């Protein structure tokens, strides 16, 4: 992949596509007798959520609240646009709005032939962009150093922002501020809180040397998945059908799967004002089971 600059934030978003669904290559096969064994679908969904999710310590999962602005740098324009189109398609399927041309990118995707050196320079130049507060917004200093020194083909860093669930006002003190923000409390409740966690921005760095031989379509699906959710960079989904296995040769898939789509849809439909983070993850797992069941019952697409 040639390293010429293409600013994806300046390019027009594609027209709204149909909702994103996992692609299916083969028609279903009729099986007369099926014996179900192993863990229940509910257990599998809870395990999937537990493995892939990586919110800041003690926090509920964050998601984009209304809109995203996608930028791609250091790729030829045609490759950059393909990534923008795919990430936009996934965002639109989650009822997000795509920023207009010229918007400030909050999903920044950068390709580099010296990924670690480039990442370290970014963090050194703008440390508060990666850790804007002492806690609650990111995975912490140890995780940031792992991000800087990662050997992964694709690395990412999410920054979330706790905000008042009713007003959207920031609910955390940032570096350099002396007084904490005042957060209005809705009322005494053990189930519902007064804040939600919104994604503020994500930086995704692609090592061009390590993604050679991978089609831009498959890579775009992988990038879209990590752009839309706080995915654990150390996630191990061996034996699970997921685009997150792209760099796991034994379990590699070529597109976003039913499990991936179900997770994103469940995340974006879950209540964000849960007072207890585990209540949110339980809701996501329950919704995933419904989504995966619906996907398995859908008719196979025509070739």
Predicted regions: what they are:
Residues 28-32, 60-75:
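Acidic/histidine-rich, surface-exposed loop or edge segments in extracytoplasmic proteins
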Residues 19-21, 26-39:
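N-terminal secretion/transport leader regions
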Residues 1-9:
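Sec-dependent N-terminal signal peptides
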Residues 10-11, 24, 280:
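Glutamine-centric residue-chemistry signal
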Residues 71-86, 91, 95-302:
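Long, folded non-catalytic interaction modules
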Residues 12-19:
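Intrinsically disordered, low-complexity proline-rich regions
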Residues 40-64:
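Compositionally biased P/S/T/G-rich terminal and signal peptide-adjacent segments
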């Amino acid at each position: 992949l040639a390293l010429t600059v293409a600013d994806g934030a300046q390019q027009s978003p594609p027209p709204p596509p149909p909702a994103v669904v996992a692609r299916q290559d083969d028609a279903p096969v009729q099986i007369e007798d099926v014996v179900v064994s192993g863990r229940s679908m509910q257990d599998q969904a809870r395990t999937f959520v537990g493995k892939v999710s990586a919110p800041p310590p003690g926090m509920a999962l964050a998601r984009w609240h209304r809109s995203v602005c996608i930028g791609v740098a250091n790729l030829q324009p045609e490759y950059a646009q393909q990534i923008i189109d795919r990430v936009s398609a996934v965002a639109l399927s989650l009822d997000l709005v795509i920023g207009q041309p010229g918007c400030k990118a909050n999903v920044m995707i950068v390709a580099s032939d010296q990924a670690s050196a480039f990442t370290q320079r970014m963090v050194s130049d703008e440390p508060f962009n990666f850790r804007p507060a002492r806690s609650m917004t990111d995975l912490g200093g140890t995780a940031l150093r792992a991000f800087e020194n990662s050997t992964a083909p694709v690395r990412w860093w999410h920054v979330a922002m706790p905000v008042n669930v009713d007003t959207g006002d920031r609910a955390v003190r940032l570096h350099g501020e002396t007084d904490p923000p005042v957060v209005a409390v809705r009322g005494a409740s053990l189930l519902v809180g007064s804040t939600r966690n919104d994604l503020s921005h994500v930086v995704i760095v692609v090592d061009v040397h390590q993604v050679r031989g991978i089609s831009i379509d498959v890579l775009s699906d992988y990038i879209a998945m990590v752009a839309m959710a706080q995915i654990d960079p150390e996630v191990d989904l061996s034996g699970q059908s997921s685009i997150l296995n792209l760099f796991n040769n034994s379990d590699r898939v070529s597109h976003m799967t039913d499990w991936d789509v179900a997770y994103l849809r469940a995340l974006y439909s879950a209540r964000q004002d849960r007072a207890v983070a585990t209540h949110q993850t339980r809701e996501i797992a329950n919704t995933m089971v419904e989504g995966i069941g619906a996907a398995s019952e859908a008719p196979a697409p025509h070739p």
